[in-house]
């Protein structure tokens, strides 16, 4: 699983990047078929950063979430939570499909 973090209109500290990477890696434990994770932080408005998270899984399944908050780590937490919900729903859908077959 490849994780990419990019920043627009600013930079992140090494500590912030490490914390974000640790939070995003948890998605891989939730759903093992993830191939690529891309997180983009837009710091154009420093008081309200925008966090955009895009996840690609096997068989061309893509998931995405965006959140704007007045706190960077709060926005990261929210966007990861949104993706966790999407992945749980998708995983449940797959499991139910295989049970009915």
Predicted regions: what is each one?
Residues 1-101:
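N-terminal, polar/charged subdomain of small-to-medium soluble alpha/beta proteins
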């Amino acid at each position: 699983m490849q994780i990419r973090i990019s920043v627009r209109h600013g930079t992140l500290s090494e500590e912030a990047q490490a914390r974000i990477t640790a939070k995003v890696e948890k998605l891989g434990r939730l759903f093992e078929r993830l191939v690529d994770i891309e997180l983009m932080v837009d710091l154009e408005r420093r008081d309200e950063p925008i966090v955009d998270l895009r996840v690609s899984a096997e068989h061309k399944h893509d998931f995405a979430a965006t959140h704007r908050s007045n706190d960077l780590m709060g926005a990261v937490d929210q966007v990861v939570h949104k993706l966790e919900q999407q992945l749980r729903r998708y995983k449940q859908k797959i499991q139910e499909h295989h049970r009915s077959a």
